Amino acid sequence: MKFSKGWGAVLIIMLLLILDQALKIWIKTHMQLHESIEITPWFYLYFTENPGMAFGIEVIGKLFLSIFRIVAVGFIGYYLYKLVKDKYNFGFIACVSLIFAGAIGNIIDSVFYGVVFDHSFGQIASFMPAGGGYAGWLHGKVVDMFYFPLIQTVLPDYVSYTHLRAH
């Protein structure tokens, strides 16, 4: 059977989604918020939940952000389809497939995780809690977990966390 760039992209997306969600579910049900596990001196699994966009920036409402993510994934999916159809290099198709899978994983988090998990503050979250989840549909937090401490630095004392947050 001949290798197809389209099926290669689908395989990358499916494998990454399965690994991503399995690892996120394991982390949510086995680690407390802000707990870390050292894999190597330069790679940690670090459990944090992202309530907004990149770095936790909360500029717009959660519902709008979730809808924006869904629309963006539609555009990325169409772009990926065009790349395969126009016979682009598979290396580039694979890179866009990784981005696409990561974006879909974030949508899964924001759509479902608020409903199927309880909160993670000061406890290990439980799956399908009796009292329901911590938020409604499209209001879940995105689970972030990879941490690469490649540069060790300290911010000056006059820079506080509140200065780094978008208002």
Spans of model-derived segments:
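Alpha-helical transmembrane bundles and membrane-interface segments of multipass inner-membrane proteins
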Residues: 1-165
